[in-house]
């Protein structure tokens, strides 16, 4: 399978994960047939970058998501938190965000700690989606 097909397949898999959690997610390219959207759209408040790569440089991936979400903000004024959802072959999906962005999702941290602003946190899909769903429910007032 070539890398483009692998990427499309990964985006569809991640969209399906969100659909199983109750979101109307779909591939960004499928959304309107052109670029300029996240890899998966239909999930409020976040910019989703999907990667299926055995040798992923997650820092470069999060930087790409940050650049792309900043460009989207310039066009729409919609501020989205970047997250990279990634996995290697035969492994589970993981979600990586900057620690400060994750803290804005989770609301607070039970202890004080000094962290670098470029610190990254990687969580399993199941842990991350619980944090995200609590944030989204609170923010939407549902």
Regions found by a protein language model. Name each.
Residues 1-142:
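Catalytic phosphate/metal-binding cores of nucleic-acid and nucleotide-processing enzymes, i.e., regions
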């Amino acid at each position: 399978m070539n890398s483009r097909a692998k990427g499309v397949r990964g985006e569809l898999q991640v969209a399906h994960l969100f659909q199983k959690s109750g979101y109307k997610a779909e591939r960004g390219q499928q959304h309107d047939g052109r670029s300029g959207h996240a890899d998966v759209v239909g999930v409020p408040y976040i910019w989703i970058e999907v990667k299926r790569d055995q040798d992923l440089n997650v820092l470069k991936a999060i930087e790409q998501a940050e650049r792309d979400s900043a460009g989207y903000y310039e066009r729409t004024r919609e501020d989205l938190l970047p997250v990279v959802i990634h996995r290697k072959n035969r492994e589970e999906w993981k979600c990586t965000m900057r620690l400060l962005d994750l803290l804005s999702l989770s609301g607070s941290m039970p202890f004080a700690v000094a962290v670098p602003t470029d610190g990254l946190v990687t969580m399993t899909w199941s842990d991350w989606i619980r944090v995200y769903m609590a944030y989204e429910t609170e923010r939407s007032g549902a």
